[in-house]
């Protein structure tokens, strides 16, 4: 368990102690295997490989033999010993009964290809397809094509490339197949065939970088290319100067016979070069000359954005958005552009103008999704102007129009705030009482209770007791499952049963055993989706996931069971405590609790943060690049590692180690808490969106924490603060003593 959580020093100590105390040869082998995996997690690949080779020499009959070969393959590949890596993966495939042989064969092929052993690579990739027909055949066939290419068997290589082109529906893969086929044709001296492949990509897949590579070859060889398509490919590749030149040539040669799209992409290209005046000029060419163009509405938005964000001309930006709405009041974009006009006015400090624009949304577009939010923000604008009667009127309208308990609670909060600001304490209390009852597990109801008690956000008794046993809680959970879902008494919920033979269970375990945790989690997610309506086997899966410490899919599985029982957020807390402890677990407590305490962060709050950030998955990575349990961005991590002067020899990959990630996260949150003078709300906002943004929002809101939340510019950060509050509320309910 210490290995999975990233507490590598402890893991090595435990494995070493187990090795020394082992009563059998098999136990010694398993302990040595754990030591090797620990070195691998440290990225000490040479030491890891030595450990696994020692295991092979001392315990050649061990049950972990096959997995040892796999781990050797992983280490040798990272050490650049590709021939040894390929051999190790092949040995795994030959000795393992595991269901992930397709992965081993694929990795063998990759290693052999890097070792220039092309025939072995071809055989390995073909074996991968035979082992699992559902595997990624596009990747495998492209790799086989590359191997034949390297063997100078270009005809066969092209056959593989074009088979991928014909079979896949993915544009990027098609562009890759075209590029490889075209390059092979060129090697054969068949230039016309090569150019046909490159041109096909330029015309059909302009977003693909491989299309840009093909375009570069066409241009270098003097092959004529449609200038608009040439500009488009350059634009998507980030080659904005060449894109502009191509669009200009296209427009010069087609002054009348073009649909205006070139102006849009030329404008974008100027924008990314920082040439804002030229960008606006191009957008206006499209706006005034081509009202039927696909990008016509987008051009208005781009123009307004440049005026507002880049040129600091908010009046013209507002006029642009309002001009669009005036010209095209029935356009799908009209409500959003009206909302943006209000947003620009608000950012410019013109709060009354913003309020009037936002109020107009509900009048003109009552069914638009953004209109209710616009109405609410109108109330916030009046409140910031100290026009409490106007704000109260808007919030009362929001209350009437609100369709969800959350919207009702939110409106009541601000009705109460208006009464409080006007000196009507009794009416304020009545509104907050109503808010507290509207949606008890929701942020605004939680905040209403704090207001009734005169508390700031994140003010709570920090005492806790994380002592619980899921094992002791299972009997109650299973009895509840049987009575709620009519599961027969003779159905054994405590064992996997037939689920043990499920291919996804086997793959999940196999991936876990060779430290491929992301792939194990992916298999778990696929399986829980397949079992979504199978309560009994979902529960069996849940217990397996807990055993493997795959907490993220375990939480989702438990939530699905609760949903199928017809329970909402509030009533779910009346289910057996087992399910609440799974969904809001004190996971990794040996790491998280002392680390949180070391940096003066309540473990209850830190658990809420980690649950929000990663759902307790140490190996998760966001699309933005954040990684690990506390979702740290690489640049933020490096800054804090430099301040901590720990860990030694830090690498971004260390963010997947729980001890490293949690330490950096707690240290950074503590820094932000100190920077913002103990204001946890601002510190959390800074953790999510950066201290500069948090400072700006504090300046707008003064000392009002409720206003702080509403003036946050990023919906993600607003949701972040609300979710952490909601999760913290449950952690307090469950663990506070």
Q: What residue spans do the PLM features occupy?
A:
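Residue-level recognition of tetratricopeptide repeat
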Residues: 1, 37, 74, 110, ...
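Position-specific recognition of the canonical hydrophobic site in helix A of tetratricopeptide repeat
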Residues: 3, 40, 77, 113, ...
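Residue-level detector of the short coil/turn that links helix A to helix B
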Residues: 6, 43, 80, 116, ...
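Short solvent-exposed coil/turn linkers within tandem alpha-helical repeat scaffolds
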Residues: 19-28, 56-67, 91-103, 127-138, ...
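Catalytic glycan-binding domains that act on GlcNAc-containing polysaccharides
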Residues: 334, 348-353, 357-358, 385-386, ...
